[in-house]
């Protein structure tokens, strides 16, 4: 009798592991930047003398601009090397997060959250496109699972650490912490990740 055996799980190469870690860390920083705003609300409102509605608008500004960004980039994202696209949006996210930490007025805060949302809101979809390009079908489920660990870690580890830092050095300090980590990740992506441009070799469909 022929016995059917389940296919063995293919192992990740060292380069694939590096890519997974980098994408998970981008997920960690982007999600933490969004999630940390609400816990910082009390400190931020007292420091900047904001009303609850003003603070709510600052939180919503990120989500709104992220949605707009997703619509705007849908038409051209596939025309570029995904690594370059990730670096572009991630450096914009870093700049917006740094702006959040340096803000001294409500107008600056709203502007910073809009900038952060415009760039950060696309990073997740770019990361998923990279996964689709670099990993075979049988590995993608595991890769996405590892990437989602970045989401969970941002809540389980990132928020408590951020609140501790905020209570010690001020509400701006978590944003600076995110910037430092994100800059390190950006540099590693820049120097270690290979171009992700296989999709550019596929000719566009002709009507």
Residue locations for each model-derived region?
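Flexible cytoplasmic inter-helical loops of multi-pass small-molecule transporters
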Residues: 191-207
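Conserved MFS/SLC helix-loop-helix module at the cytosolic interface between two early adjacent transmembrane helices
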Residues: 68-104
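Extracytoplasmic
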Residues: 18-52
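Paired small-residue
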Residues: 96, 107-115
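Helix-loop-helix hairpin linking two adjacent transmembrane segments in secondary transporters
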Residues: 146-190
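Cytoplasmic helix-loop-helix junction between adjacent transmembrane helices
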Residues: 112-150
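Residue-level signature of mid-helix packing/kink "hotspots" within the transmembrane helices
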Residues: 35, 63-71, 155-156
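Membrane-interface helix termini in secondary transporters
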Residues: 43, 71-75, 164
């Amino acid at each position: 009798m022929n016995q059917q055996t389940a296919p063995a799980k293919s192992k990740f190469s060292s380069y694939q592991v590096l890519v997974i870690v980098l994408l998970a860390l981008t997920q960690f920083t982007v999600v933490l930047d969004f999630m940390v705003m609400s816990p910082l609300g009390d400190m931020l409102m007292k420091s900047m003398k904001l009303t609850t509605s003003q603070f709510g608008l600052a939180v919503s500004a990120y989500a709104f601009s992220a949605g707009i960004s997703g619509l705007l980039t849908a038409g051209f994202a596939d025309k570029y090397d995904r690594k370059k696209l990730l670096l572009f949006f991630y450096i914009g996210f870093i700049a917006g997060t740094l702006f959040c930490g340096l803000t001294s007025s409500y107008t600056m805060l709203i502007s910073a959250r809009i900038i952060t949302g415009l760039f950060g809101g696309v990073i997740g979809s770019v990361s998923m496109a990279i996964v689709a390009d670099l990993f075979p079908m049988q590995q993608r489920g595991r890769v996405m699972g590892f990437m989602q660990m970045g989401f969970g870690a941002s809540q389980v580890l990132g928020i408590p650490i951020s609140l501790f830092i905020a209570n010690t050095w001020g509400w701006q300090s978590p944003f600076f912490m995110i910037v430092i980590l994100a800059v390190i990740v950006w540099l590693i992506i820049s120097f270690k990740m290979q171009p992700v441009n296989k999709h550019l070799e596929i000719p566009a469909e002709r009507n």
